[in-house]
């Protein structure tokens, strides 16, 4: 009962936060509109509550300083990392480069030239283009509820999903892009792209395709959750036998009965030589 009360208290607190007009901690500051239907669906269940979400986004990120106390952290974001561009809106993918150039504090060089060999070090601050798909975290009342949600997500192709501590289910899919576009020349303060504008257009087209695939997957997940977890009352006319889950005590008693039955059969006259 205490665990149930703790879950219900947590759920009430989360739902109050969702209803609040205060910005959240994400770069956008609000729940993505595309996530609202599936969030509302899941939160309608007494056994689940959503804790965080992202409907999918395109971002351009400038890595921060990677050296710390004389050590270089390869590939780390480090200190001073900066979001150059972020959008969760499919319609705002095309044209991000022009918008970034008009607003950025940096100057730009789109030469398409490779990085000079002498500058390729572990401390270089790369410009990273990313498409990140839908992700949803759901806290469940117990492991049984978490397992049902996990299995439902996996059956829809969300193969990166998992169950963490406290019955927290992470629903993820691997349709991402993660591509370096250039680097920051810290001497001149210039963002130097070693890809061409044409290559950026190719990435944008790929991202649009991934947005579309992502939306289809989200809809498939919504439909499956609605069918299997929300509107899942058994059909009284169904011929399928539904086997109830055994408790530990029931399993212990069954094993005891089976053992006694085996002993009885071994002692029967037909088994005596």
Curated annotation (Swiss-Prot):
Pfam families: TYW3
Pathway: tRNA modification; wybutosine-tRNA(Phe) biosynthesis
Residues modified to Phosphoserine: 26, 238
GO MF annotation list: tRNA methyltransferase activity
Keyword Iron-sulfur: no
Highest taxon of the lineage: Eukaryota
Signal peptide, first to last residue: none
Catalytic activity: 4-demethyl-7-[(3S)-3-amino-3-carboxypropyl]wyosine(37) in tRNA(Phe) + S-adenosyl-L-methionine = 7-[(3S)-3-amino-3-carboxypropyl]wyosine(37) in tRNA(Phe) + S-adenosyl-L-homocysteine + H(+)
Entry GO CC: cytoplasm
SUPFAM superfamilies per record: SSo0622-like (SSF111278)
Enzyme Commission (EC) number: 2.1.1.282
Regions of compositional bias (Basic and acidic residues) in chain numbering: 246-264
Record's keyword terms, sorted: Methyltransferase, Phosphoprotein, S-adenosyl-L-methionine, Transferase, tRNA processing
InterPro entries linked to this entry: tRNA_yW-synthesising, tRNA_yW-synthesising-like_sf
Further comment found in the protein's record: Present with 3390 molecules/cell in log phase SD medium.
Annotated family: Belongs to the TYW3 family.
Function: S-adenosyl-L-methionine-dependent methyltransferase that acts as a component of the wybutosine biosynthesis pathway. Wybutosine is a hyper modified guanosine with a tricyclic base found at the 3'-position adjacent to the anticodon of eukaryotic phenylalanine tRNA.
Protein name, as recorded: tRNA wybutosine-synthesizing protein 3
Native organism: Saccharomyces cerevisiae (strain ATCC 204508 / S288c)
């Amino acid at each position: 009962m205490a665990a149930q009360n703790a879950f219900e208290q947590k759920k009430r607190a989360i739902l109050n936060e969702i209803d609040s007009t205060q910005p959240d901690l994400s770069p956008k500051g609000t729940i993505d509109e595309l996530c609202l239907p599936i969030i509302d669906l899941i939160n309608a269940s007494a056994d689940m509550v959503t804790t965080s979400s992202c409907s999918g986004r395109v971002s351009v990120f400038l890595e921060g300083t990677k050296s710390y106390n004389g050590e270089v952290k390869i590939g780390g974001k480090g200190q001073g990392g900066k979001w150059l561009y972020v959008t969760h809106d499919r319609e705002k993918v095309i044209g991000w480069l022009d918008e970034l150039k008009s607003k950025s504090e940096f100057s730009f060089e789109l030469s398409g030239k490779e990085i000079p060999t002498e500058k390729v070090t572990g401390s270089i601050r790369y410009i990273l283009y990313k498409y990140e798909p839908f992700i949803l975290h759901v806290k469940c009342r117990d492991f049984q509820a978490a397992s049902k949600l996990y299995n439902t997500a996996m059956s829809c192709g969300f193969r990166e999903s998992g169950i963490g501590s406290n019955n927290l289910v992470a629903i993820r899919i691997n349709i991402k892009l993660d591509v370096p576009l250039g680097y920051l020349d810290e001497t001149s303060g210039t963002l130097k792209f070693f890809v061409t504008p044409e290559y950026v257009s190719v990435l944008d087209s790929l991202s649009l395709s991934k947005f579309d695939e992502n939306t289809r997957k989200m809809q498939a997940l919504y439909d499956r959750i609605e069918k299997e977890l929300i509107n899942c009352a058994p059909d009284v006319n169904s011929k399928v036998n539904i086997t109830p889950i055994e408790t530990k005590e029931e399993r212990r008693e069954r094993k005891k009965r089976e053992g006694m039955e085996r002993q009885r059969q071994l002692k029967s006259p037909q088994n005596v030589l």
